[in-house]
Amino acid sequence: MSEIIQDLSLEDVLGDRFGRYSKYIIQERALPDVRDGLKPVQRRILYAMYSSGNTHDKNFRKSAKTVGDVIGQYHPHGDFSVYEAMVRLSQDWKLRHVLIEMHGNNGSIDNDPPAAMRYTEAKLSLLAEELLRDINKETVSFIPNYDDTTLEPMVLPSRFPNLLVNGSTGISAGYATDIPPHNLAEVIQATLKYIDNPDITVNQLMKYIKGPDFPTGGIIQGIDGIKKAYESGKGRIIVRSKVEEETLRNGRKQLIITEIPYEVNKSSLVKRIDELRADKKVDGIVEVRDETDRTGLRIAIELKKDVNSESIKNYLYKNSDLQISYNFNMVAISDGRPKLMGIRQIIDSYLNHQIEVVANRTKFELDNAEKRMHIVEGLIKALSILDKVIELIRSSKNKRDAKENLIEVFEFTEEQAEAIVMLQLYRLTNTDIVALEGEHKELEALIKQLRHILDNHDALLNVIKEELNEIKKKFKSERLSLIEAEIEEIKIDKEVMVPSEEVILSMTRHGYIKRTSIRSFNASGVEDIGLKDGDSLLKHQEVNTQDTVLVFTNKGRYLFIPVHKLADIRWKELGQHVSQIVPIEEDEVVINVFNEKDFNTDAFYVFATQNGMIKKSTVPLFKTTRFNKPLIATKVKENDDLISVMRFEKDQLITVITNKGMSLTYNTSELSDTGLRAAGVKSINLKAEDFVVMTEGVSENDTILMATQRGSLKRISFKILQVAKRAQRGITLLKELKKNPHRIVAAHVVTGEHSQYTLYSKSNEEHGLINDIHKSEQYTNGSFIVDTDDFGEVIDMYIS
């Protein structure tokens, strides 16, 4: 035997072979045919069961026998894949109308595996036989099987639109399909309307076919998504569980789930809800129970007393498979190719298939009727000359000779002669003659009717309509899925997601933040907070886990951090740097932090920069749903820094102090509300080379403490300040020296809450009591606290 060796590039061989493989799995494995809604393996299973007489009116047979028939004659693949497909056709939570009835364990909605095929038994369902009806009447084309030992159908007659009724799902090379199941009566009604009016619009069709009808029921939201899918083949809907509320004897409420979204694993859903409860992601759930039994699906979610059941339900819709989105992708094989099809195209393809099936069946029946008519006419003729026929047969040598004599003497045809010689003697009665004459009349009427169907397209369509109506009447069922026009917006109260707990929030000047339990805080003391060397406490306060923290930086940005998302860390331990929660720039510094309980308030923030700009923005502007990156609080120009952020419930006085000792006090009412991206207006008229070191709210009982670079502290009372208008130069608070003048490096408004100060140089720090600093007059430079020769030049001061 000679060998032919071809020299081919690997690229060409791979491309060619993968192309063949892709075509095979697209056409022969993963995608359904638009005409019968079946994938090849499903079609082969149903045909194998039908061929072997495993029909609904017979006893159940072992599934292993069917699997053996399928892989032995039609589907040369693994037995597991065939059995898996067979089981799916029997699962009433997967198919709207099952095509196989199965005895034994055929899996569950919990995704439990079915029993082995040697244990289960199956037979065709009554509806499945409507897919195969008339297959023996040459209605569809047959092709040789994989080893040319028998024939198999290319498609089933499919007397109802199975693709829409039972839907399909599958993935192949470059294609995927997701076609939802629908209500059989609605689909047939829509098909009937399409037959009457091929120009019917999708809107008109949707009067009859409302939308998907999932075997698991549920609530479908989004008419627009359904319409889009029916028009283009692609669309999105929301499918949510059916949830009812019950009240228990102890006064508690519980949510009862009786229907879940299509193809959601029930046990996984129960597990997920219980995990949300155990992980305290949702507050208010006592227990989750799966109470499903023979009477139907039932999941009970027992709630705590006085919780908002609607909010818990909404939280579960959003954070579990209690609600899912279903994406239509209606791809099917049409004319040998995968196509994305709208509902009109699917119905049209099905209708064309039915026209062909009914026409082929009519031709087959007409041919048989004409053949029978021919035989009946021969028998009637023979009975009219019965004595001569009998005499001729008796004088013949054998059967063959008798047939030839009948053809030659009486001009019977071959078929008629065969029927005559096979006629039994008891048939030669008057009763039989009358019966033959009656049959002749019936055949005449039948032939006339069949020819009319073939010659008249409307008559053929009427046959299709009549048969569809019969199936509709016989198999119709109530819709299981409720359809709602709009997709409901899910609103979740924060109280449901986060248990309410009072905690201590702390922020250090170097940006370390944490929340600490009241118990841990009380067991220690403010001074015992965990700090890095050189760091100090910027702020600490009692907050609730349902509050939100706004962290402001020198870049004019803010971080929006829900308190419950902060790490729960003991008071004596180091907190978490804000950059680990929300990424910030390397040179970005935290300048203040505030706690918000409710953003629906008249309160406002005031922002002040080093170069003397100021602005006011209302608190509601800062509410956001984005937690993962810094947001703009105010526009900070180049070579400027935000140095102060204040929060006020109402307008009040603020004091601005500059490096060169100027001070201006005015009311925030002079500031207009502005957006977050605004830069603001001029706060103070700065001298050359001067800059702002402090902008803070001030009241009549407050004092102001200032620190100079030379180690001096000066404390003044409110009465020295002169209330003026914004953008003026202000008053002088220092005595100007010609040599080494004092410059204010830090200043703070001192209220009754403050008792200590801390001075910082690059390498040292000095602590003292604020009350030890006597109040000074306006034109003084205060009192020296540290010797800069030993301590170093003062660079900052904090008060606490």
Curated annotation (Swiss-Prot):
Gene Ontology BP term (one): DNA topological change
Role played: Topoisomerase IV is essential for chromosome segregation. It relaxes supercoiled DNA. Performs the decatenation events required during the replication of a circular DNA molecule.
Assembly: Heterotetramer composed of ParC and ParE.
GO cellular component terms attached to this protein's record: chromosome; cytoplasm; DNA topoisomerase type II (double strand cut, ATP-hydrolyzing) complex; extrinsic component of plasma membrane
The enzyme's E.C. designation: 5.6.2.2
Annotated site location: Transition state stabilizer: R118
Domain Topo IIA-type catalytic: 31-495
Protein name, UniProt field: DNA topoisomerase 4 subunit A
Entry similarity comment: Belongs to the type II topoisomerase GyrA/ParC subunit family. ParC type 2 subfamily.
Site (Interaction with DNA): K39, H75, H77, R88, K94
Pfam families referenced in this protein's UniProt entry, alphabetically: DNA_gyraseA_C, DNA_topoisoIV
Catalytic activity, as annotated: ATP-dependent breakage, passage and rejoining of double-stranded DNA
PROSITE patterns: TOPO_IIA
Compartmental location: Cell membrane
Keyword Chloroplast included in the entry's annotation: no
Entry-linked InterPro entries: GyrA/parC_rep, Gyrase/topoIV_suA_C, Topo_IIA-like_dom_sf, Topo_IIA_A/C_ab, Topo_IIA_A_a_sf, Topo_IIA_dom_A, TopoIV_A_Gpos, Type_II_DNA_Topoisomerases
Principal location class: membrane
Taxonomic superkingdom: Bacteria
Gene that this polypeptide is encoded by: parC
HAMAP family attached to this UniProt entry: ParC_type2
Catalytic residues in the record: Y119
GO molecular function: ATP binding; DNA binding; DNA negative supercoiling activity
Record's bilayer topology term: Peripheral membrane protein
SUPFAM superfamilies assigned: GyrA/ParC C-terminal domain-like, Type II DNA topoisomerase
Keywords: Cell membrane, DNA-binding, Isomerase, Membrane, Topoisomerase
